[in-house]
C-alpha cells in the first residue's frame, strides 16, 4: 500500500520500504550584497529496514536553470526513493537560486557559483555527520540534472583561480569549498562519482589532468537548452556559453586520467525523462533507463 503525504504543497507517495525526513537544515548561506542568510535544507531517504551498517549516499541536485526548482520535484523524489529501495541513503538538497527580477548572464554565472558552493557544503555536511546518518564517506555520489548537473560540474572542476570574475567582489561569496562550520570546513569535498544529466561546463579547460572523480554523462543530442556540444545556454545569444557532455567527454578522453561514461540519446531533447518539461511529469520508461545507467555506474565505481 502506498500512502500520499503533502510535502511543500506537493503530493508525494510514501513507500513502506523507505523512511523519509523532510526539511532538515544543512547550511545558512548569503546572497551577494545581503546580510540576511537563507536556510538551506534537504530531504533524507533511507531503507525502512536499514541496519546499523554504513550505506552509500546519493546527493541529488534539482534542475531549473538556476531560476526555479525544488528539492521535492517529482524526479528528485523518484531518484531518492529508488536509491533507498536498493539499500542506499539519499538526500535531495536545496541550493540558492537566482534572486527575483535579476535574470542576466552575469547573475546566472554568479548563481551557478553559489549553487556549486552549496553542493560542496552539502557533501562536507554529510561527511561531518556521517555517523548520525550512517554514511560510508568513501561511497558518496552526486547526481544532478540540468542546472543541478552544472552546479556539480563546477564544484568538481573549478579551482580558486578559475572562479568567475562576477563572484570576486562579494565577501559573501568566499572560496568554493570554504562554507560551513569548523567541522565541515575540515572535510574534503571528494566524492566517489558523479552522475551528470544534460549538464555543461562554462570552460572545458577547468577539467585538469589531476581530476580523480569518475563521471557518468547522460545527454540528449537534440538538446537546445544546454547543447550536447557547445553553444549559448538556452540558445540565447548573450547568455553564458556552454560546453556540453560530448565536449566534456572529449576533454576527459584527451587527459586520460579519469574514468568516464558518455551516454548520448539520439533524437532526445533537454531533460528527456520528463513527458512535458513545463509540467515536470516523468516518463517512466525513460526515467528507468536513466536509473539503470546511474545504478550500474555506481556499482562500477564504489570504493570499499
Question: Language-model segments: which ranges?
Answer:
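Cap/lid segment of the alpha/beta-hydrolase catalytic domain
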Residues: 66-75, 94-113, 158-159, 268-278
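Short amphipathic alpha-helix adjacent to the substrate-entry channel of hydrolases
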Residues: 72-92
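Alpha/beta-hydrolase fold nucleophile elbow
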Residues: 133-144
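N-terminal cap/lid segment of alpha/beta-hydrolase-fold proteins
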Residues: 14-53
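Alpha/beta-hydrolase active-site loop
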Residues: 108-131, 154
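C-terminal catalytic histidine-bearing segment of alpha/beta-hydrolase fold enzymes
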Residues: 242, 246-304
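The feature captures the conserved acid-bearing segment of alpha/beta-hydrolase catalytic domains
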Residues: 171-255
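Short beta-strand element of the alpha/beta-hydrolase
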Residues: 53-65
Amino acid at each position: 500500500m502506498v500512502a500520499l503525504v503533502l510535502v511543500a504543497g506537493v503530493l508525494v507517495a510514501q513507500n513502506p520500504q523507505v523512511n523519509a525526513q523532510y526539511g532538515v537544515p544543512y547550511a545558512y548561506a548569503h546572497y551577494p550584497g545581503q546580510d540576511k542568510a537563507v536556510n538551506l535544507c534537504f530531504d533524507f531517504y533511507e531503507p525502512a529496514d536499514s541496519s546499523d551498517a554504513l550505506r552509500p549516499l546519493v546527493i541529488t541536485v534539482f534542475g531549473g536553470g538556476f531560476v526555479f526548482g525544488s528539492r521535492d520535484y517529482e524526479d528528485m523524489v523518484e531518484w531518492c526513493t529508488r536509491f533507498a529501495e536498493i539499500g542506499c541513503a539519499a538526500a535531495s538538497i536545496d541550493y540558492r537560486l537566482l534572486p527575483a527580477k535579476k535574470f542576466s548572464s552575469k547573475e546566472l554565472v554568479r548563481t551557478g557559483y553559489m549553487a556549486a558552493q552549496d553542493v560542496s557544503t552539502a557533501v562536507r555536511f554529510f561527511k561531518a555527520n556521517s555517523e548520525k546518518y550512517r554514511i560510508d564517506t568513501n561511497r558518496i555520489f552526486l547526481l544532478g540534472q540540468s542546472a543541478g548537473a552544472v552546479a556539480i560540474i563546477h564544484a568538481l572542476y573549478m579551482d580558486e583561480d578559475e572562479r568567475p570574475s562576477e563572484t570576486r567582489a562579494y565577501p559573501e561569496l568566499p572560496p568554493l569549498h570554504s562554507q560551513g562550520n569548523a567541522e565541515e570546513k575540515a572535510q574534503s569535498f571528494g566524492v566517489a562519482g558523479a552522475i551528470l544529466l544534460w549538464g555543461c561546463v562554462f570552460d572545458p579547460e577547468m577539467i585538469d589532468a589531476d581530476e580523480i572523480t569518475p563521471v557518468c554523462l547522460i545527454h540528449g543530442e537534440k538538446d537546445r537548452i544546454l547543447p550536447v556540444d557547445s553553444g549559448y545556454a538556452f540558445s540565447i545569444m548573450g547568455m553564458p556559453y556552454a560546453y556540453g557532455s560530448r565536449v566534456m567527454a572529449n576533454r576527459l578522453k584527451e587527459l586520460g586520467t579519469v574514468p568516464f561514461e558518455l551516454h548520448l540519446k539520439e533524437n532526445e531533447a533537454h531533460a528527456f525523462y520528463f513527458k512535458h518539461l513545463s509540467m515536470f511529469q516523468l516518463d517512466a520508461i525513460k526515467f528507468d533507463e536513466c536509473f539503470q545507467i546511474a545504478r550500474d555506474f555506481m556499482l562500477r565505481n564504489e570504493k570499499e
